[in-house]
Amino acid sequence: MQGLSTQIEPIPGRWWKLAGVWALYMAFGLNMAGLAPLVPDIEADLGISHASMGTVLGAWQFIYIFAAIPCGLVLDRMGTRRALFWGALLIGASGIARGFAQEYLHLLAAVALFGLGGPLISAGAPKVVSENFTGAERGLAMGIYITGPGVGAMVSLLFSQPVLMPLLGGRWGLVLILWGFAALAAGLFWLLVGRGVTRSAGPITPSAPLWNEIGAVLSLAPVRLILLMSIGVFSINHAMSNWLVEVLHNFGAGLKQASLLAVVPAVVGIVSALTLPRLATGSRRFGVLITLFSCSLFGSLLFLIGGMGSWLYLALILMGIAGGSMMTVLILTLVEVPGVGERRAGTAGGFFFSAAEIGGVGGPVAIGVLYGGSGGFSSALALLALVALLLIGAVVPLRRLLAGSGKAQ
């Protein structure tokens, strides 16, 4: 059986559609990271504790886990153009509502709303790419759009406190409202450029029972394995993104130095996302996955044995290479599983992100628990290395399962 990439003709205007998806994902990153640099101001203004603020910051992820699968089903039935626009509206409404929050519960509800819009964007983006790109172009397109959240997060972190807070008279609510309107603008841009999206495999008819579609996706053994692998990938990515500064500080770096060093894997990750996914075609995909998981493994081990020594920069580079492309290549593999394709990419993407966010929440929590028990990060880094090793081992059965489906070449 030939891969889907050999069956679909390139679609005119696909790069404009990719630009629209990137804008949506960038707005996703803006609003996802928008609270972090404003936490001290919000806590002081609303009179809430660190513990309460922690529940606010995690509210959208909790909702996201349960909303991702229904959102994926909506994507396949509604179509990407309308569904992604609704995602942008929900994210924009979340940002604007945060800006008007006057107490803890209002802020909590506003942030939770992001968990309803976010899955439409994150599950819809790979569906748009699978509908419009083929072969190496598909990998490149996925690598490009996946940089959007990182760019949005960096813009939020770099501009909120140094530029926007002084410019807006120290009113943190106006900053959050600005990010909300950025999401609405991205939604309008997508509505303009997203016209004409087609699905050559045919849409799922609204009359088709939902459980049939869910069962059809989960009945595929490669999909089930990829969902398990997604938990491991998000455990590593979210653990490192949330704890890296503290890990470096624990190893002896000052807070300013640790913050600067933490930029290294972020920059390397962008380069990785723009280069490696386009190589992950056909049977080469498995070699790329093993390489990425190996980079994560050796990065964690170098942190363990090297600390702030001469191996530090190599460890940061390896973690950046892995973090920039692991998720992208895994999603690329998912949407090309026979029985998924463009037709069920939204549903499969919903399952992917629902499962993955279990690791996204659990990874950082596990690191915090291990640190609290030992007073250091050695056991936590050993756990991340073990997860990477398990991911390497999972590539072999994944290749065998896909070969049985006629995908491996």
Annotate each PLM feature.
Residues G3-I11, G196-L225:
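Juxtamembrane intracellular "pre-TM" segments in multi-pass secondary transporters
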Residues A110-G148:
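Cytoplasmic helix-loop-helix junction between adjacent transmembrane helices
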Residues G341-S374:
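A late C-terminal transmembrane helix in Major Facilitator Superfamily
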